[in-house]
Amino acid sequence: MNLLAFGGGTKRTAKADAVITGAGSGIGRAFATELIARGGRVVCADIDEVGAAETAERLGDRALAVRCDVGSIDDVIALADTAEGWFGKPADLVINNAGIGTGGAVVGETSLADWRKTVDVNLWGPIHGCHVFAPRLRAHGRGGIINVASAASFAAAPRMSAYNVTKAGVLALSETVSAEMAGTGIAVTVVCPTVVKTNIFDSDTIADSASGLISTLVKWTGVEADSIARGVLNAHDRGQFYVVPQLDAKVIWQLKRLAPRTYTHMLGLVERAAR
């Protein structure tokens, strides 16, 4: 159940010129579609050139596809320059959404290659995005940053160490940037969803032993990406920082804070049952 799709105006996101990473599919494509519906223009960035082009083609002449590897600072700088040139001004909104799923193995069995790949995309991506776009937004004097983290940033589920760590980093980065942007006219929002119906877990960093469970979760509990995107943009319009859109994530968020020992014990039971 998505609790955010209802209500909320479109003042901040109306007619926004936005840059979206990971816009070739999933939540990124949904953000682009919703922003176009709100009268904006979007730069659809993705390492998957075909996916980015498909998104832009669907959206018409107010969308531009750009290939970007968010793990490369040079690519992100080029993305910002391209967007500014196309818009004719700095972007109003930056959505650091690109990410990959990783899971299925315990610490010590997750390969270092998977760790590095996950950190490069999931953590360095938002770091690069904030590093490059934050100064431009400050100079612009208005706008916003939306960072897509995950409920994994606080849930700490077993066998998802690399994913958990990177998303926790995105949450901490967002909290820091929000404080640093206070009084500048720049709004910051961080999104912490659980299961969304996207292809993020269609990755070689997902162990075969976990792929079946993930597919089942997506099928039976996943929320549609367009519902998440709409709710997040509405929340950003309201100036909301933390966005925890689904009921299961809200329960985890509260349980961990109100009863941390109980929560940790429950995670241990889940891990033992999975062996």
Give short role names for the model-derived ranges.
Residues 105-107, 111-116:
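Substrate-binding pocket helix/loop in short-chain dehydrogenase/reductase
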Residues 130, 166:
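Active-site helix of classical SDR
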Residues 150:
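Residue(s) in the substrate-gating loop at a strand-loop-helix junction
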